[in-house]
């Protein structure tokens, strides 16, 4: 009603962070559950490289790159672990908008 509320389900005691924050949406300087976003992205790249090496996938490539901004640390982690050179063929130009979303206040 307008003057009260009813709890349908009590909140849990455990925090569950969406993996999308670590892999894409979270800023590099942010930390979730005590883990820095940039560090997690490097780790993800490292794990991908280890997986590819174990399965003999993508070993005959010239360089590793990521799509800016969030993909770059993944690629650096991959390159560092695999020994394959990192390169930046894509450079994102963002003079005013922090993310690739269309601003709601367009004029």
Language model: regions and residue ranges:
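PRPP-associated nucleotide enzymes
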Residues: 1-107
């Amino acid at each position: 009603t307008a003057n009260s509320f009813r709890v349908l389900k009590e909140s849990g005691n455990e925090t569950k962070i969406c993996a999308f924050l670590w892999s894409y949406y979270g800023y590099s300087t942010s930390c979730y559950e005590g883990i820095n976003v940039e560090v997690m992205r490097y780790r993800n790249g490292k794990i991908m490289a280890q997986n590819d090496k174990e399965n003999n996938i993508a070993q005959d490539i010239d360089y590793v790159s990521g799509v800016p901004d969030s993909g770059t640390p993944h690629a650096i982690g991959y390159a560092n672990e695999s020994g394959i050179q990192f390169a930046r063929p894509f450079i994102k130009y963002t003079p005013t908008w922090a993310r690739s979303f269309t601003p709601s206040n367009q004029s």
